[in-house]
Amino acid sequence: MGRVVVDVMPKPEILDPQGKAVAGALPRLGFGQFTSVRQGKRFELEVDGPVTPEVLAAAAEAAEQVLSNPVIEDVVRVADAEADAAATISSGNLA
């Protein structure tokens, strides 16, 4: 069974009150090095079988038509979750 990850973010010109609230809290909690936060959404779509280019194309279409509001959001990533996790682990980043 495969899995596709879709990340959606607010368009840059759209106010992000959740991100602003998090950005305000970070310095108070000892994380002053972060100056800005944008909060988005992550979707994980499971499929029967492997993630093929056709599955990724269908996920991208679903992301544009159903998972995001194109007036205020951008789809910033559609990826095979397994390949994405392998890249994250090999780079030493947190998964």
Language-model regions, residue ranges each:
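Non-catalytic terminal accessory/regulatory regions of metabolic enzymes
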Residues: M1-A95
